[in-house]
Swiss-Prot record:
Membrane-spanning segments: 280-300
Subcellular locations according to the entry: Membrane
Domain of life the protein comes from: Eukaryota
Extracellular side: 21-279
Keywords assigned by UniProt, alphabetized: Glycoprotein, Membrane, Signal, Transmembrane, Transmembrane helix
Protein name, as recorded: Uncharacterized transmembrane protein DDB_G0281067
Length: 300
């Protein structure tokens, strides 16, 4: 499970190659880039709810917080602006939250949190939305997301909003990262495969054009970077031994660093993780078995 989370963590580093180091992942925030900009981490304010939560203090809602680099550590506080605002005075409701791992985020990794909304809370903002704020008081990272509150969400288990497997079988769904077609991948619940694939392609194009990210943007570099980026953007479900299944080898990752001249940022690309997993070309795991394994993972 740690290796799986590490794989997903790399996605954040590659997609958000900036100085920020902690960010809300789910519900989808105004900005997917980690930021210390008060009070919502920058980005564009959403006018449509990203998710519907349960307004009942006896029920839990799932949020996902990610620390990309160590300076993003610290307890995460959740507040709610029921009027949909984003100013200091709007965030009047502090929500109760608990990290599933049992301790506050202290190191690089992905953290799932159960968040409770006081019973009877209603959203009065435009389109019936509230603004959810998540921030670390000790290290000062901020994120916000537009959400709705409705009792219909109270019947859904919080676990459903953690990780969900997708059986990618239709090629039209994933065109850029077509290496995952007909594969079972793990992505946050609610992810639209086509949109996610397009966003990954956009990240690829932007980074290839940015010399601060990719030092040598040759065609050989592009081929290597595409494989690495798609592998971490669409992590495959783990094998029967619990280890992640990678579609990139450690050698390919190291070649990417060298050919693309990203040696100065080598700490952001832990190629050693590829030596701990299984190559997808060597192991074929039945879909039913993968889903069973995933179900066990989500229990812990």
């Amino acid at each position: 499970m740690r290796l799986l989370i590490s794989c997903i963590l790399i996605l954040s580093i590659l997609v958000n190659f900036i100085s920020g180091h902690a960010v809300l992942v789910a519900p989808t925030p105004f900005s997917t880039n980690p930021s210390k900009t008060k009070l919502c981490g920058g980005g564009t304010k959403q006018t449509v709810a990203q998710i519907t939560w349960c307004p009942n203090s006896s029920k839990t809602n799932r949020a996902t917080w990610k620390i990309v680099v160590g300076d993003g550590a610290g307890a995460v506080t959740f507040k709610l602006a029921t009027n949909g605002g984003t100013t200091e005075g709007d965030f009047t409701t502090t929500l109760t939250s608990k990290v599933l791992s049992g301790s506050d985020p202290k190191e690089v990794g992905t953290y799932y949190m159960d968040v409770r909304v006081p019973t009877g809370t209603t959203c009065t903002g435009t389109n019936g939305i509230c603004t959810l704020q998540a921030y670390t008081e000790s290290s000062g990272w901020y994120s916000c997301s537009a959400i709705k509150l409705d009792s219909s969400a109270c019947d859904k288990a919080a676990e459903e909003t953690a990780l969900v497997e997708y059986n990618v079988q239709v090629k039209d769904n994933v065109k850029f990262c077509d290496q995952v077609v007909n594969k079972v991948v793990l992505l946050p619940a609610g992810t639209q495969l086509g949109e996610y694939d397009q966003r990954t392609q956009g990240v690829f194009k932007n980074n290839m054009a940015n010399p601060l990210v990719i030092g040598q943007n040759s065609s050989q570099c592009g081929n290597l970077y595409e494989k690495v980026l798609c592998d971490v953007s669409f992590p495959l479900a783990p094998g029967s031994d619990g280890k992640p299944i990678y579609q990139v080898t450690q050698k390919q990752c190291e070649d990417f660093i060298e050919v693309c001249d990203v040696v100065s940022h080598v700490e952001l690309y832990p190629c050693s993780i590829y030596g701990d997993g299984n190559g997808s070309n060597l192991i074929i795991i039945p879909t039913l078995l993968i889903i069973s394994i995933l179900s066990l993972i989500l229990m812990f």
